[in-house]
Swiss-Prot record:
Gene symbol of the encoding locus: iolC
Protein name, per record: 5-dehydro-2-deoxygluconokinase
Any Pfam family hit: PfkB
Keyword tags: ATP-binding, Kinase, Nucleotide-binding, Transferase
Sequence similarity: Belongs to the carbohydrate kinase PfkB family.
Transferase in keyword set: yes
Matching NCBIfam families: myo_inos_iolC_N
Function: Catalyzes the phosphorylation of 5-dehydro-2-deoxy-D-gluconate (2-deoxy-5-keto-D-gluconate or DKG) to 6-phospho-5-dehydro-2-deoxy-D-gluconate (DKGP).
CDD domains, sorted: KdgK (cd01166)
A GO molecular function held by the record: 5-dehydro-2-deoxygluconokinase activity
Classification of source organism: Bacteria, Bacillati, Bacillota, Clostridia, Eubacteriales
Length: 339
């Protein structure tokens, strides 16, 4: 069933907005970050990873963001170009802002952490004047990242994109993507998350992220069902609440729910799965698949990523995901993720 009605004949199918960074993942893993000496550089940042993921899946992808005017910024633009992602709306920071840097720790397959450098960064300098209405008018959907709301002027730029999307019948997907950096306090988080969450068509986040978004509008923490009912009531068509290794559930505006579990894999790291999940799930929605099929596709892609060293570099193709699902079902049974 198609819960989302996308406009036809648009140049782009999806345009993420917001954070792009550089990830440094340790080569010498299974030790604390303080002991790692060798790292490999990758493109990073949830919106950027989602863009790469959807491009690998064959979608026509654009991107709205700002990068540093240096070698790292050039690396991002060149990487996107090589992936077939339109870079016409990626701006360069003019006042010396740097690209966000992320150093990851892979202490063990289940113990991973992230150290981010997010001061004076380019992506939060995206300005309202750099949001082009024609670009948003020419895409089926935009993805707004919660990190884009953390600070002005990026905050206002994201809100302008939201308003222009609603004006032009462009679908809005809100990926909550909470990162503690750059926010002043939890009330600020709740205010701006709610503004976008109340106007989006699809909202995706972890249980903890929904708790943050709802902290000013409820007295006590909600159950998943209560949160889903609330955000569907605001007008969302699909609400996805994630619980990590416990799986996730999609709630739809016809009062149905669909639960998916992770596919079994040998973990390498415990981060990166969320972006792969989002890109593959969104792919299924763009293809107007049944919700359960889209969830299964997302869960499979996430499993593949947590078994891989990078996030962006290891984003799978449609063929690779289908082969992975087929292999796991042959090994564990047809309902391995759906049971």
């Amino acid at each position: 069933m198609g819960y989302i009605k996308f406009q036809k004949d648009r140049k782009f199918e999806i345009v993420p907005i917001g954070r792009v960074a550089i990830d440094f993942n340790p080569i010498d893993i299974n030790r604390p970050l303080s002991e790692s000496k060798t790292f490999k550089k990758y493109l990073g940042g949830s919106p950027a990873n989602i863009a790469v993921g959807l491009s690998r899946l064959g979608k026509k992808v654009g991107f709205i963001g700002k990068v540093s005017k240096d070698q790292f910024g050039k690396f991002v633009v060149d990487y996107f170009d090589n992936e077939g992602i339109d870079t016409s709306q990626i701006k360069y920071a003019e006042n010396g802002e740097s690209l966000g840097l992320t150093f990851t720790e892979i202490a063990s397959p289940t113990e991973s952490s992230i150290l981010m450098y997010r001061n004076g960064i380019a992506d939060l300098e995206l300005d309202v004047n750099e949001i082009d209405e024609e670009y948003i008018k020419n895409t089926k959907a935009i993805v707004i990242s919660g990190t884009a709301l953390a600070k002005s002027p990026s905050r206002e730029a994201a809100l302008k994109a939201l308003e222009l999307a609603k004006k032009n019948d462009t679908i809005v997907i809100f990926d909550v993507d909470y990162r503690e950096y750059n926010w002043k306090n939890k009330d600020e988080i709740a205010i701006y998350y709610s503004i976008v969450g109340k106007q989006s068509d699809i909202v995706m986040g972890s249980r903890e992220e929904f708790d943050l978004m709802e902290s000013l509008i409820v007295k006590e923490k909600s159950t998943d069902e209560e949160s889903a009912k609330r955000w569907l009531g605001f007008g969302n068509k699909i609400v996805v609440i994630k619980h990590g290794k416990e799986g996730s559930t999609a709630y739809t505006n016809d009062r149905k729910s669909y639960k998916i579990k992770p596919f079994p894999v040998k973990l390498l790291k415990s981060f990166g799965g969320g972006d792969a999940y989002a890109s593959a799930f969104i792919y299924g929605i763009l293809e107007e698949w049944d919700i359960m099929d889209a969830l299964e596709f997302g869960s499979a892609s996430a499993a593949m990523l947590v078994a891989s060293h990078s996030c962006s570099e290891d984003m799978p193709t449609v063929k690779e995901i289908n082969e992975f699902i087929k292999e796991k079902k042959e090994q564990y049974g047809e309902m391995i993720a759906r049971g």
